UniProtKB/Swiss-Prot annotation:
S-adenosyl-L-methionine among keywords: yes
Catalytic activity line of the entry: trans-aconitate + S-adenosyl-L-methionine = (E)-3-(methoxycarbonyl)pent-2-enedioate + S-adenosyl-L-homocysteine
EC number of the protein: 2.1.1.144
Keywords from the UniProt entry: Cytoplasm, Methyltransferase, S-adenosyl-L-methionine, Transferase
Gene Ontology molecular-function annotations: trans-aconitate 2-methyltransferase activity
Matches recorded under Gene3D superfamilies: S-adenosyl-L-methionine-dependent methyltransferases (1.10.150.290), Vaccinia Virus protein VP39 (3.40.50.150)
CDD domains xrefs: AdoMet_MTases
Protein name stated in the entry: Trans-aconitate 2-methyltransferase
Record HAMAP family: Tran_acon_Me_trans
Native species: Rhodopseudomonas palustris (strain BisB18)
Origin superkingdom: Bacteria
Job of this protein: Catalyzes the S-adenosylmethionine monomethyl esterification of trans-aconitate.
Length: 256
């Protein structure tokens, strides 16, 4: 994929940050020394960590140059590094690894979660949140349109970039032997958005990118028109004209 677009991502900053707040609230540490925010994006989640633990050394990690540029502007004086979390290891002494909406993009992420828990200090925390929405209309429609002509050959690989998340029991079996305590839960958010086009704008910042990035501008416009029509049918307006974007998310908090 092309580089992430921080400006597009931040169009729905409050809604995207809410799960990070909910995840952070479940970390039972008062005074961590080192904290890593992996998949930090434009720094909205990193800012939450800095505010909660101002005494800690907080480092943001991401693969996107544009996201890191935005994060450094947002939090000058804090440490941000460009790295792939599939190969990144937390520095010695790390107490918290915070992973908000990133592991869904990492193949075989269970093994990486095991590796990160193993690298934590005793009592350290791996806190993870992932969208669990591939079976929601917003994402089903992406694939349905992509499987049509004239896009089906060009977008054949797009639907393979993300797999459905494993069942909660798989996370439990993989992580429980490494932990003193393990919490796993789902939360379903119902985000109030202006209209169907707002849903399209939301997913253009994340899940829709593998489908539109490979397309030239005329093809992209045609794809988006077909996708938007399906979204409008799948998300009818409420009595006040707004629409509700149903968004399930999986949370995991592993305490070593």
């Amino acid at each position: 994929m092309a580089d992430w677009d921080a400006e597009q991502y931040l169009k729905f900053e409050d809604e995207r940050t809410r799960p990070a707040r909910d995840l952070l609230a479940q970390i039972p540490l008062d005074d961590p020394r080192r904290v890593a925010d992996i998949g930090c994006g434009p720094g909205n989640s990193t800012e939450l960590l800095v505010r909660r633990w101002p005494q800690a050394r907080v480092t943001g990690v991401d693969t996107s140059a544009d996201m890191l540029r935005q994060a450094r502007e947002r939090l000058p004086g804090h440490n941000f590094i460009e790295a792939n979390i599939a190969h990144w290891a937390p520095p010695v002494g790390t107490d918290v690894v915070f992973a908000n909406a990133v592991f869904q993009w990492v193949p075989n992420h269970l093994k990486h979660m095991q590796r990160l828990v193993g690298a934590l200090e005793p009592g350290g925390v791996l806190a993870v949140q992932m969208p669990d929405n591939l079976d929601e209309p917003s994402h089903i429609m992406m694939r349905e349109v992509a499987f049509q002509e004239p896009w089906r050959h060009q977008l054949a690989e797009a639907a393979q970039l993300r797999d459905n998340l494993p069942k909660p029991g798989a996370y439990y079996d993989a992580l429980r032997p490494l932990c003193s305590r393990l919490e796993i839960w789902h939360t379903v958010y119902n985000h109030v958005l202006d209209d169907a086009m707002a849903i399209v704008e939301w997913v253009k910042g994340t899940g829709l990118r593998p489908f539109i990035d490979p397309l030239e501008l005329p093809e992209r416009k045609a794809y988006l028109a077909a996708y938007t029509a399906r979204i409008a049918a799948a998300y009818p307006p409420q009595a006040d004209g707004k629409v509700l974007l149903r968004f399930p998310r999986l949370f995991v908090v592993a305490i070593k």
